[in-house]
């Protein structure tokens, strides 16, 4: 499941505010995505994160 993947900032130096599902807390948490090399646990909105990961 993408919701159990770790937060992955990526190797690029962009600045994209995103959300990931933190499986330890059971919550969608904000983080800054670098723009490339991430994984599926990377959502543009809090609503999208909550809808997919049922947070």
Curated annotation (Swiss-Prot):
Keywords of the record: Aspartic protease inhibitor, Disulfide bond, Nematocyst, Protease inhibitor, Secreted, Serine protease inhibitor
Disulfide bond entries: 3-53, 12-36, 28-49
GO CC annotations on file: extracellular space; nematocyst
InterPro entries registered for this protein in UniProt: Kunitz_BPTI, Kunitz_BPTI_sf, Prtase_inh_Kunz-CS, TFPI/VKTCI-like
Keyword Cytoplasm: no
Domain annotation BPTI/Kunitz inhibitor: ranges: 3-53
Record function comment: Active against serine, cysteine, and aspartic proteases. Can bind vertebrate trypsin and chymotrypsin.
This protein's name: PI-stichotoxin-She2a
């Amino acid at each position: 499941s993408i919701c159990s993947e770790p937060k992955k900032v990526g190797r690029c130096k962009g600045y994209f505010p995103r959300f990931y599902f933190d499986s330890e807390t059971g919550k969608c948490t904000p983080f800054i995505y670098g723009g490339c090399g991430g994984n599926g646990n990377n959502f543009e909105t809090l609503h999208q994160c909550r809808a997919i990961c049922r947070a």
